[in-house]
């Protein structure tokens, strides 16, 4: 997977307690900022989950496409030439008999 593992979850951030000191930070301001961080974490986690699902789906699709027999250019060209020949016979063959 990735080299960096996420160490915090939104729940960890929400439940984090800070010691109060005489000249500490404004608790309401810290709480509001932590709420923003939690929302970002949740959004990032949701996006990561969606991207992982899409990645897995695309990998399955690639595997399925690789399993299908590849149509060679020679076979395709032969088919086109055969169709063209049949068409010429159909179109020009009628004119010969008219």
Curated annotation (Swiss-Prot):
Question: A GO term (biological process) for this protein?
Answer: regulation of cell shape
* Highest taxon in the source lineage: Bacteria
Task: Say yes or no: keyword Transmembrane present.
Answer: no
Q: Which InterPro entries match?
A: Cell_cycle_GpsB, DivIVA_domain, DivIVA_fam
Q: Name one GO cellular component term.
A: cytoplasm
Q: Which residues form a coiled coil?
A: 34-71
Keyword annotations for this protein? Answer: Cell cycle, Cell division, Cell shape, Coiled coil, Cytoplasm
Location, primary (coarse class): cytoplasm
Where in or outside the cell it occurs: the entry states: Cytoplasm
Record family assignment: Belongs to the GpsB family.
Which PANTHER family does its entry note? CELL CYCLE PROTEIN GPSB (PTHR35794:SF1), CELL DIVISION PROTEIN DIVIVA (PTHR35794)
Q: Which NCBIfam families match?
A: DivI1A_domain, PRK14127.1
Q: What does this protein do?
A: Divisome component that associates with the complex late in its assembly, after the Z-ring is formed, and is dependent on DivIC and PBP2B for its recruitment to the divisome. Together with EzrA, is a key component of the system that regulates PBP1 localization during cell cycle progression. Its main role could be the removal of PBP1 from the cell pole after pole maturation is completed. Also contributes to the recruitment of PBP1 to the division complex. Not essential for septum formation.
Q: How does it assemble?
A: Forms polymers through the coiled coil domains. Interacts with PBP1, MreC and EzrA.
Report what the protein is called: Cell cycle protein GpsB
